[in-house]
UniProtKB/Swiss-Prot annotation:
Name of the gene: wecA
Organism: Salmonella typhimurium (strain LT2 / SGSC1412 / ATCC 700720)
Bilayer topology term: Multi-pass membrane protein
Cofactor(s) needed for function: Mg(2+); Mn(2+)
Protein name: Undecaprenyl-phosphate alpha-N-acetylglucosaminyl 1-phosphate transferase
Cellular component aspect of the GO annotation: Gram-negative-bacterium-type cell wall; plasma membrane
Localization, UniProt: Cell inner membrane
A Pfam family per the record: Glycos_transf_4
Role noted for this protein: Catalyzes the transfer of the GlcNAc-1-phosphate moiety from UDP-GlcNAc onto the carrier lipid undecaprenyl phosphate (C55-P), yielding GlcNAc-pyrophosphoryl-undecaprenyl (GlcNAc-PP-C55).
């Protein structure tokens, strides 16, 4: 595929999604598909929840525009469409967690039975021995689908963060697949980014605060499902493009945040799905950073971790078990910082004050 052709297609997807999201936000306001501020949501005014619907429209446009060969494409679009519809209904009418979990489980079963996408192996994470899962892989796949959807749902807490973290994941997968010759799958990843960018621009208020939109559960569900579909497509089989352990690095921040916060809630005797303000973005902002700064810092951290995974995938000299050990070390470091968040926040504030004093004193020294 010519690079110029690929670029023109991505620009077309971006422009289509931009136009669609502006039209969709008007419809959303009329039908009540909006997010209203409450004790946890501190935004001003009602915000249309059309980011996810627009991303899905952009992806449908991409597949209608091109002739890429994507295995079981029709099945993916049907499954994703169902999840987006249920997510939109949840955004509008607040569907119970149990109903959403059942729908996600049914979609996962359909994916495993018809598309044959499931975890059959976790690779060589124990040295020279491949960890083959057998029938247990189907149960683990069900959990993986649920985990991916909820991981990206949980990081959708401040402006731009879900879009930034998902773009990092899709970019990492896209680069690996592009250089591996999997052009169609790589373009799918890049198309996801092109469809997400208009949402990021409106969500951050780059085109004006009055055009602000949110992703909604429809969007976070779509992103999580697409990520796990692509990872199952590319990490399994005899000639897989991505090692299973690399998948952990590609979605590191959403995965770490979900596991850490659910563990903390369970230890307190709370439901793992109960809302709170203990996510990574809340803790970073508590350390004295603004919402925009937290978005940049967390996205940068995700890019670094994904970069480690991509580099190891290309280097081929770092064993998979070493990458697993390094990931677990990174996870425990993350957990340590989260568990002692107040100490970390106090340390960061102290450093920021010290740097501020140094900047203030510097002009006096030069006089």
């Amino acid at each position: 595929m010519k690079l110029l052709t690929a670029l023109s297609e991505l620009i077309s997807i971006f422009l289509f999604t931009t136009i669609f999201i502006f039209l969709a936000r008007k419809v959303a306001i009329k039908i009540g598909l909006v997010d209203k501020p409450n004790f946890r949501k501190r935004h001003q005014g009602v915000i249309p929840l059309v980011g996810g619907i627009s991303v899905f429209a952009g992806i449908c446009f991409m597949f209608g525009l091109s002739d890429y060969y994507i295995p079981h494409l029709s099945l993916y679009l049907i499954c994703a469409g169902v999840l987006v519809f249920v997510g939109a209904m949840d955004d509008r009418f607040d569907i119970s967690v149990k109903i959403r979990a059942v729908v996600q489980a049914v979609i996962a079963v359909v994916m495993m039975v018809i598309a044959k996408l499931h975890l059959g192996s976790l690779g060589y994470i124990f040295g020279p021995w491949e960890l083959v899962l057998g029938p247990f892989g189907y149960f683990l796949t069900l959990f993986a689908v649920w985990a991916a959807i909820n991981a990206f749902n949980m990081v959708d807490g401040i402006d731009g963060l879900l879009g930034g973290l998902s773009s990092v994941s899709f970019a990492a997968m896209g680069l690996i697949l592009w250089f591996d010759g999997q052009t169609s799958l790589a373009m799918w990843c890049f198309a996801m980014i092109a469809a997400i960018l208009p949402y990021i621009m409106l969500n951050l208020g780059i085109l004006g605060r009055r055009y602000k939109v949110f992703m909604g559960d429809a969007g976070s569900t779509l992103i999580g499902f697409t990520v796990i579909w692509l990872l199952l497509e590319t990490t399994q089989g005899k000639t897989h493009s991505i090692s299973p352990v690399t998948a952990l690095w590609i979605i590191a921040i959403p995965l770490m945040d979900m596991v850490a916060i659910m563990y903390r809630r369970l230890r307190k005797g709370m439901s793992p799905f109960s809302p709170d303000r203990q996510h990574i973005h809340h803790l970073v902002m508590r350390a004295g950073f603004t919402s925009r700064q937290a978005f940049v810092l967390i996205t940068l951290a995700a890019a670094i971790l994904a970069g480690v995974g991509v580099t190891a995938e290309y280097s081929h000299f770092v064993p998979e078990w070493v990458m697993l050990v390094l990931f677990l070390l990174a996870f425990f470091l993350y957990g340590y910082c989260i568990k002692r968040a107040w100490k970390v926040a106090r340390f960061i504030k102290r450093v920021k004050r010290r740097l501020r004093r140094q900047r203030e004193n510097r002009p006096n020294l030069t006089k």
